[in-house]
Amino acid sequence: LKGNAADPAITGLDTATGVQTVTIANLANATWQDFLKFDALVGDMAITGTPKFIMRSASRQTLKGISKDSGSGRYICEGNMIDGAAVEIDGQIGADDIFYGDFSNILVGTWGGLEVMLDPYRWARSGQVEIIANLIADVAIRNPKTFVKRVKS
């Protein structure tokens, strides 16, 4: 999900061209309307999978404490869902990152298959064998417009 700002060849949802955005400057002040925008942006993109949110655990906890409106007793995130979409947790994205979309549009390509090699020499003194597995893969986004990311400004 995360690209590498130092190497433009390594992109993720956060740096990919064409990914749509919703501006939420301060998550603690987010509104229900802010989160309805995520689905509105991908709704016309002919998605085939089930859209989901991905965010940090702290962000999900914050949204569990923000009321949808005054008086209903309902919250933006209830039962780890926002507007019927699952909220998944990823500890490797940025603290402020929120992604939404059809993750079946993230493709993984592999070359040459899985290569497994046995090294009988490295641990020979202890009677063990080292198993080495290599897989060459790359990731691509089929349709960036099926994703939305939160931006702060």
Feature map (PLM): residue ranges:
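Sequence/fold signature of self-assembling virion shell proteins
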Residues: 67-153
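Alpha-helical scaffold segments that mediate packing/assembly in large oligomeric complexes
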Residues: 1-42, 149-153
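Active-site pocket-lining segment
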Residues: 56-70
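Hydrophobic alpha-helical scaffolding
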Residues: 25-31, 53, 75, 121
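Long, contiguous amphipathic alpha-helices that act as assembly "spine/axial" helices in icosahedral shell
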Residues: 1-18, 43-54, 58, 87, ...
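Domain-core detector
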Residues: 32-35, 52, 59-61
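Short, conserved, surface-exposed binding loops centered on an aromatic residue
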Residues: 40-47, 77-80
